[in-house]
UniProtKB/Swiss-Prot annotation:
The lineage of its organism: Eukaryota, Fungi, Dikarya, Ascomycota, Saccharomycotina. This is Phosphatidylinositol N-acetylglucosaminyltransferase ERI1 subunit. It is a multi-pass membrane protein. Probable component of the GPI-GlcNAc transferase (GPI-GnT) complex in the endoplasmic reticulum, a complex that catalyzes transfer of GlcNAc from UDP-GlcNAc to an acceptor phosphatidylinositol, the first step in the production of GPI-anchors for cell surface proteins. Ras may inhibit the enzyme activity of the GPI-GnT complex via the association between ERI1 and RAS2. It comes from Saccharomyces cerevisiae (strain ATCC 204508 / S288c) (Baker's yeast). GO terms for cellular component: endoplasmic reticulum; endoplasmic reticulum membrane; glycosylphosphatidylinositol-N-acetylglucosaminyltransferase (GPI-GnT) complex.
Amino acid sequence: MRPRDQGFLVLGFTYSVLLISLATFYWLRNNDSFLHYWCVLLLCPATLWLWALIAWCDSEMFASSKDE
């Protein structure tokens, strides 16, 4: 697999993690329990950190890839 294709694969995975997290937070918004607050407090920073880390690694892969 070419590095550029690997970069697109990692980028797609990154955005899918972000979209699944946002959809989960949206679903929990209408929940009456206090689970919503714990999920936002604990998972939102971890999700954003993971998204930034994978996006940075992906940008490094794109920067070092060569068109063949």
